[in-house]
Amino acid sequence: MKAIAYNNFGNTDVLQISEQAKPSVQSNQVLVRVKAFSINPMDWKIRKGEMKLMSGSKFPKNTGADFAGIIEAIGSSVSGFKIGDEVFGIVKNLMKEGASSEYVVVPSSLIWKKPEKISFAQAASIPVVGTAAVTAIEKMGKINPQTTILVNGATGAFGMFLLQLLKQYGAEVTAVASSKGIEYAEKWGANKVIDYTKENVLLQKTTYDIVIDLSGKMGYKNAKAIMKPKSLFLNPTPLPIEIPLSLLKNLFTAKKHVIVLSSPGTNYTDVLLNAVKNGLDIEVNKVFSFEQYKEAYQYAEKGGYIGKIAIEI
């Protein structure tokens, strides 16, 4: 089968389509013919060597975490699925299995039936950022209509899910986005939108109970200027060194630095599936063909787009 892989750290030039053995299923696994997969920041962070502590330096490495497709084979102990089911899910180890391939084998616990109302590209956009959004809301603690929340970088894939899921809590949500993202942020539930091309959010006088930085550009040190005396800064894109440092810093301040790390689970996915049934908007900004993979990753890494980027096979 064909799969996107790389043999050394670097930019998109190191990516290549390689021939790999078609995987076979074990008793608790399913074989999925991939119809679409999506791109996440961790794909290029690992490829560029920014996460060596986690990824190691052994090659070749595959890439891609979440996918959608059709089941072609089922292990003997798998229940609840059948051959021909349209599903979406996440691979167990993106550097080994990699969703960016014609076939993936995954435990049945890491796939879910695709709602008929959404496309394969939309379904493949759910697992990583969707579960991250649910995790972030859990980290926020008790949210009510008096809770003020600032979402920086609100119209990327993470923000798309987060803004819509936050609506049910009635919190006062301010989104920071570009001029072209204002319409989307409002549609997804933001009460107020700050256009970062016209206003520096760090220079305003308003302070917040919760600040979440989805862009990775604000940082805890800067965010403290717009945080209430007792507040939370949520960081879903931490550098490895920030994880232990945040624990130490939190001992000495009421402005807490909270690291958001997530992994898909049944409870999280149930929340997302219910949201899809209730009209959750999944904006796929652009869909590329498998042969356009380098162009797709270059486009994704450049940023500045609304929603998610997907590749169809």
Task: Kindly label every feature range from the protein language model.
Residues K217-N278, I313:
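Glycine-rich phosphate-binding loop and adjacent beta-alpha segment
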Residues L203-I210:
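A short acidic, Gly/Pro-enriched loop at the edge of an enzyme's catalytic core
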Residues K22-S38, M51-N93:
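Glycine-rich beta-strand-centered segment in the early N-terminal region that forms part
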Residues A124-D195:
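Mid-domain Rossmann-like dinucleotide-binding core that forms the NAD(H)/NADP(H) cofactor-binding site
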Residues I90-L150:
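NAD(P)H dinucleotide-binding glycine-rich loop of Rossmann-like/cofactor-binding domains
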Residues G265-I313:
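C-terminal hydrophobic helical "lid"/dimerization subdomain
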Residues G75-S77, V173-Y184, K217-Y220, P240-I241:
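Short glycine/proline-centered loop/turn elements that form peptide/ligand docking sites
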